[in-house]
Amino acid sequence: MSNNYQKEIQTKLTKGLLDMIVLQLIGHQSMHGYQIITKIRKTFGIYFGPSTVYPFLANLEKKGYINSEWNLTAEKPRKIFTITAAGKTMLKFTEDSLGLICRTMHSVENAAAATSTVEIAPVAH
């Protein structure tokens, strides 16, 4: 598998889990949008720009999973995002669901490996 293809798969998976990643990040510490973008890049090695991250943030806020508040005391006004109780519940559900998917994939893989390595002895005539 080529490095480009691996990177493409990692990017797709990360983008698919972006809600969970954002909730996880701001669950540990309230952050503004640029901090979230930077943390994702440093943690996953993938850059999602403002045009990707801010709509995710708006959607999470609309669903009640995060709150935002303007910090006007900083050098530059920043919208600070924090996780809500509903966001913590959703994060836990998403983490549990992802764990179940991974366990299921491993059990399917192990079952396939077990059946493919079984050797049937030839019948003597």
Enumerate the language-model features and the residues they cover:
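Amphipathic alpha-helical dimerization/coiled-coil segments
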Residues: K92-H125
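Generic recognition of well-ordered alpha-helical segments
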Residues: T38, A85, L100-R103
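Beta-hairpin "wing" of winged helix-turn-helix
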Residues: K63-P77, T82
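N-terminal helix-turn-helix DNA-binding core of bacterial DNA-binding proteins
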Residues: Q10-Y54
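Short, Lys/Arg-enriched N-terminal segment that forms or immediately precedes the first helix
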Residues: M1-T11
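Short, contiguous hydrophobic alpha-helices characteristic of membrane insertion segments
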Residues: T11, Y65, T115-S116
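Short, hydrophobic-biased segments on the C-terminal half of alpha helices
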Residues: Y54-E61
